[in-house]
Amino acid sequence: MEVFLVLFLQKKNILMRIFVCEFVTGGGFAGAPIPAGLRAEGEMMLRALLADLAAVPGVRLRVCRDARLAAFSVPAETVAVEADAFWDIMRAEIAAAEAFWPIAPESDGILLRLSAMARGKILLGSSPEAVRLCTSKTATARHLAAHGVPTAPALAPGIAAPHGAIVKPDDGAGAEGVRFFADPAAALATARGTQGLIAQPFIAGAPESLSLLCNAGEATLLSCNRQIIARLGDEFHYRGFVVGGAEEKRALYTPLAAAIARAIPDLFGYVGVDLIAASSGPVVLEINPRLTTSYAVLGEALGVNPAAMVLALAAGGVSPPAVSARPVTLALP
């Protein structure tokens, strides 16, 4: 398939100036301390993406970099971002590029704002409309449930929560801000007492994720992943993941991926799905309309260039044939 993608892109005569913004390392925290864990994950995703894009003939890259961080060797022109200059630089760089690939959290509307700035450009990510929906876990769950996709319900009086409950930000990313409550009533009271928090029953099962390639209501399932999450007291912490670590469930997850893409047809390019493999079947927790940390080793797991797949879709190509992933483990700091 790698040869097919290269030949397709060469046939299309791709000559594309792409601006890549990884929010955490790219100046989004300029003027504020950069959380070490987020920085490490951002670096992993960014390096993998730039290497993949640079391998595509005809692509020229620019990337933003927080001016406080050491220069790093990447196949791209680097734009230093000083404090308070981030959004001005985004506007200028997006305007000068042909295509824009944002890597940013949904929280605080950051990914939505960046995606909306790409109007009139090739956005190598999901549309602002899809990002807006997926930013809210509550809105996403309701939307998916209405389309027959199994999701975690909102906690309410009368909703069964035999394993306890969790409280988390409605627009949070990953395990950030997620707390466990043995008493569902206490979880509900906490969520109702703080704006922006939601409560859900704790779903017992294995934490897993999917890496998808989406376009026009269709999805190619790239990899089925196992997440390594530790619960310390009432908090949850990501310790790493095994991309391709749940490939034995591909037959189960392929129709789920298709259902998600049909439910949110504006999803485009790489999309991550967090879920719980419960005894009753998979339960979707959230949709990430952006790169997730799994991307850092996705190409290694697939033996194919995932970014080339996205560019092929953007150039009018059809979705690639079915793929499979071998297990690749990545530990997080």
Model segments located where?
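Active-site nucleotide/adenylate-binding loops and adjacent lid/helix of ATP-dependent enzymes
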Residues: 128-207, 214-222, 239-258
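ATP-dependent carboxylate/phosphate-activation module, predominantly the ATP-grasp catalytic core
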Residues: 201-265, 270, 277, 288-314, ...
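Subset of Sec-pathway N-terminal targeting signals
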Residues: 1-15
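Structural motif
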Residues: 17-19, 98-99, 224
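Conserved protein kinase catalytic/activation segment
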Residues: 281-283
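Short catalytic helix/loop segments, enriched in acidic residues and glycine
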Residues: 33-53
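Conserved N-proximal alpha/beta basic substrate-recognition cap immediately N-terminal to
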Residues: 52-53, 60-154
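Nucleotide-activated donor-dependent transferases that construct or modify glycoconjugates
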Residues: 16-38
